[in-house]
Amino acid sequence: MMKQRFTSAATSINSKKAPAVYSMKKAVEAMTGRKVVDIGGGRYDTGAEAARAYGATVSVYDPYNRTAEHNEIVLAGAYDVAVISNVLNVIDSEAARANVLKLAGSLAPVVLVTVYEGDGTGTGRQTAADSWQENRRTASYIEEVERALEGFAVVRAGKLIIAERR
């Protein structure tokens, strides 16, 4: 995996509340009863806990907030759906974002992407010593997702991007 200039490890903040993707209607439909890998899912298991309510089993992969041993086990698994929630927006390099997307696409035939839009200006900036924010609207990621996930059909449903292997 490509080294990121900003790890944005400190942006793992949802200790009490599950990320929004775990309650978005179309995302819930895609995850119900399925095995899910959450790429960059952070140090907390709030998403996995929320997904249990609709029969999804979630494994979190996060090179900055989980141990190498944990991540190895997760990467060895087989999944129906990959989630990338509020991860692409904290990576300052398109090449590194593409690596995250390609990893997700290699692990599952369905990839669900959400981003935090920040101030929505589209002007990325450093937000802390080791953190970055792209400040881009969800729609602005579509072409990037399409480029990274060749062979996937990519659509946007509001603040959710859904990529399905053709």
Give the ranges of each region predicted by the language model.
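Class I (Rossmann-like) S-adenosyl-L-methionine-dependent methyltransferase catalytic domain
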Residues: M1-L75, V110-R166
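Catalytic P-loop NTPase motifs of RecA-like helicase/translocase cores
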Residues: T67, V90-I91
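A conserved beta-strand element that flanks and buttresses the S-adenosyl-L-methionine
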Residues: V83-N86
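Flexible, active-site-proximal loop/turn residues at the rims of small-molecule/cofactor binding pockets
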Residues: L88, V100, E117
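A short, conserved alpha-helix within the catalytic core of class I
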Residues: I91-L103
